[in-house]
């Protein structure tokens, strides 16, 4: 039996969280697959943390990260460096994930060399090319050149069908990010920051998106601080992104507030367990919108659009935008209205059962 050579290409922390379960599933089936892992290093330190947690060792590391890198740098470097790897390895299929510049450039490189692409987390859409930016363009572009579409939900599948993608190439698998939680969330987990927050309602915050930099981020932080002043039984932890512009805004608005700790980015195992310990989550992240519902945590999404409307429809997520008064109102309501809180925390999870990787590998084996 000839083995199928599958290459997985990823470069950021969120991609790694969702691709490592797939790597490990492929490696349980060595009689069917030869698995090749190529990382671009788009997010160097944060990527390496995730690889360690899941025990994944890359076969190729393009090591593209450099100080002050732009979208031009990432796209050009991945495109040029991946060419040699693809020509050397000659994979039967290349799997990319989601909406990053790594995924876009890798898919384009595969297209130029006529290597089939499988898009994990295909079909997500906001239908606004600049929100989120550049992610909405990236994922649409990847879907143009893909041969396999692994859609996390029926709504994602419908987006692809609406764009004319053939139904025979679309599989609804659930989201591999839910698979990751099965590895990382642990009974009896402890951490000094969680011990500090014990006895309070813990608010977990993440905020880093490009389109929120500047005044929107300042508004978000001011709203959070106002609400927490009103609710002295809360404590907040904000694992802050490495982006210096994010750090500047956070320190300007939040420094000196003793019940809110700004800490360095957490490794994925820690972050998932912080989510499990939290009362609610405020975020502008994509992946957290999928992971938190699996843990029964309400999520306020500080964005104007989301490519994950299933969570909004299910009631686990609420879009609150970036206006200070709106965030203040909705955050206050969740802390004050137990009925609202219970409704959001017990809503159904639309993102799968934690076995998406197995389904994807079954398709590739077919």
Where do the PLM segments sit?
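Nucleotide-activated sugar donor-binding and catalytic core shared by glycosyltransferases
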Residues: 1-238, 243-366
């Amino acid at each position: 039996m000839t083995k199928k050579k599958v290459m997985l290409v990823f470069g950021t922390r969120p991609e790694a969280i969702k691709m490592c379960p797939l790597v490990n599933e492929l490696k349980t089936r060595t009689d069917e697959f030869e698995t090749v892992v190529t990382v671009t290093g788009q997010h160097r330190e944060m990527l390496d943390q995730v690889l360690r947690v899941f025990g994944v060792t890359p076969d190729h590391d393009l090591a593209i990260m450099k100080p002050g890198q732009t979208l031009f740098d990432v796209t050009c470097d991945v495109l040029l460096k991946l060419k040699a790897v693809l020509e050397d390895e000659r994979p039967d299929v290349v799997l990319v994930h989601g909406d990053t510049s790594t995924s876009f450039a890798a898919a384009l490189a595969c297209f130029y060399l006529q290597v089939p692409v499988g898009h994990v987390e295909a079909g997500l859409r906001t239908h606004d090319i600049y929100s989120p930016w550049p992610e909405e363009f990236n994922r649409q572009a990847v879907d143009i050149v893909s041969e396999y579409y692994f859609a996390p939900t029926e709504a994602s599948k419908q987006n692809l069908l609406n764009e004319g993608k053939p139904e025979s190439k679309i599989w609804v698998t659930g989201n591999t990010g839910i698979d990751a939680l099965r590895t990382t969330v642990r009974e009896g987990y402890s951490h000094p920051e969680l011990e500090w927050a014990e006895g309070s309602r813990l608010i977990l915050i993440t905020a880093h998106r490009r389109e929120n930099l500047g005044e929107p981020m300042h508004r978000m932080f001011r709203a959070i601080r106002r609400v927490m002043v009103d609710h002295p039984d809360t404590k907040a932890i904000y694992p802050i992104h490495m982006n210096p512009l994010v750090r500047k805004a956070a320190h300007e608005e939040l420094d000196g507030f003793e019940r809110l700790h700004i800490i360095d980015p957490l490794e994925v195992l820690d972050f998932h367990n912080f989510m499990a310990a939290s009362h609610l989550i405020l975020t502008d992240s994509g992946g957290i919108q999928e992971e938190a519902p699996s843990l029964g945590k309400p999520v306020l999404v500080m964005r104007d659009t989301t490519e994950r409307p299933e969570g909004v429809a299910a009631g686990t997520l609420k879009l609150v935008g970036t206006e200070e008064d709106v965030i203040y109102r909705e955050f206050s309501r969740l802390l004050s209205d137990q009925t609202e809180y219970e409704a959001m925390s017990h809503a159904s999870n639309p993102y799968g059962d934690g076995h998406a990787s197995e389904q994807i590998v079954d398709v590739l084996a077919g």
